[in-house]
């Protein structure tokens, strides 16, 4: 990736793993679903210790976090070592937080193996785990020493997981107004143009993060669709994937934007939902979502900060009265 400086390399292409270099001894934690790809990386980096973990939200817990820390301490893994993390977004979030806190910080390398992780979790330095009370309530801003998004790892990805990850790329289209990202994405990992498409999506996030690393201003726009999404995930017991939840969150945001005087983006978002084919919305009542929304980490003194799309490439961020949210949610239920 060129022209945007984050202080570490971000490579998005086939064979990106070959460019990775890690100082000191290397430990590897990886999603057990990608063990073959992880072993290739492990051999290239001369890994001395490794641990396989299940993917999914169950790994973003205090229990698993403690397990990894204790395992590193048990083998005496040193501060000058590096942690290589291979997997989807949940593993990258967990692994980055382990690296941020073990011995008060060790180097780590990120090898995202899903479209969602490549476009979202791998770049930006957000690490963390969940609590029973909500998502990402414990964490740290901590950068990797390199991100290596190897498109070869997508070749065995199930189609629904491949498609689901591109919801974040579509979100970046809504934020940037880029017509390529607003169009329907490439249909599969072998499609021509996928590399350029993903590079463009990652570049949008890199540009925002370069302005505002600690999410005190411009970076908050990246939460578009995520307030409802995180509540949906929690209220449904994480039976919905993050990608599905964000897609529904984007539709809710589009309705909110129209209600507050913005451009009508609803048809565009619904077209993306049809392409994605998420599971049917569970018809949760607003009262079931509200406790999780009110605990949202984006909450400020005046209330939860909603990211409101007023047009492709233009958003506002601020609180919205609950009466308005309740009304919009009823419209949302009629559409889904």
Question: What is each of the regions a protein language model found here?
Answer:
Residues 1-82:
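ATP/NTP phosphate-donor binding region
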Residues 55-56, 86-88, 224-225:
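Glycine-rich beta-strand-to-loop/alpha-helix junction loops that act as flexible
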Residues 67-84, 95-110:
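Non-catalytic interfacial helical region
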Residues 90-97, 119, 231:
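Short glycine/serine/threonine-rich phosphate/pyrophosphate-binding segments
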Residues 97-189:
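A glycine/threonine-rich phosphate-anchoring loop and its flanking beta-alpha core
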Residues 167-169, 263-336:
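C-terminal charged capping/lid subdomain of soluble metabolic enzymes
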Residues 183, 187-287:
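Active-site segments that bind and position negatively charged phosphate/pyrophosphate groups
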